[in-house]
Amino acid sequence: SLGGKPDLRPCYPPCHYIPRPKPR
């Protein structure tokens, strides 16, 4: 995530490198 909600997998900064469906 972009430092917001946790995605499906543990995201490391920068998170935006991993395109993941973020629940909004």
UniProtKB/Swiss-Prot annotation:
What keyword terms does UniProt attach to this protein? Disulfide bond, Ion channel impairing toxin, Neurotoxin, Postsynaptic neurotoxin, Secreted, Toxin
* Cellular component GO terms held in the UniProt record: extracellular region
Extract the signal peptide range.
none
GO molecular function terms noted in the UniProt entry: acetylcholine receptor inhibitor activity; ion channel regulator activity; toxin activity
Covalent S-S links between cysteines: C11-C15
| UniProt-annotated location(s) | Secreted
Q: Which Pfam families match?
A: Toxin_33 (PF08121)
Q: Where in this chain does the entry annotate a coiled-coil region?
A: none
What the entry lists under InterPro entries is as follows: Toxin_33
Name the domain of life: Eukaryota
Per the annotation, which location comes first and is thus the protein's main one? secreted
Subunit (UniProt): Monomer.
**Family under the similarity heading:** Belongs to the waglerin family.
Annotated function: Waglerin-2 selectively blocks the epsilon subunit of muscle nicotinic acetylcholine receptor (nAChR). Also has effects on rodent ionotropic GABA(A) receptors (GABR), since it potentiates I(GABA) in some neurons and depresses I(GABA) in others. In mice, it elicits tachypnea, ocular proptosis, rapid collapse and spasms, whereas no toxic effects on respiration and blood pressure are observed in rats.
Protein name as annotated:
Waglerin-4
